[in-house]
Amino acid sequence: MDQVTMNACSDAAFKQSDKKLNELYRQIEARLKDDADTKKLLVQAQQVWVKFRDAECSFQTSASAGGTVTPMLASMCMDGLTQSRVKDFESYLKCKEGDLSCPVPSAK
């Protein structure tokens, strides 16, 4: 498999994880529809998280900057961090009613 193909495969994996993350984000937003303050905190947290993800992956791939492998390494980094965020969002959506350690109310 050539580098262009590997770059495309890693990008496709990241895009799939990002799509899942966005689906979960919309579900969390829907649960917070009656709580504007917490919804605002979600938006802020996600914006900061995206900046962190991008900066972290730039840092992690700095040794290969400009090389043909860089896109693959960047996509792999972004995919890994996005999958971790997906797990966080999935756990938020499984909170038990009355769990004060969880920012997302249980499904009604």
Which stretches of residues belong to each language-model region?
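N-terminal alpha-helical modules
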Residues: 1-108
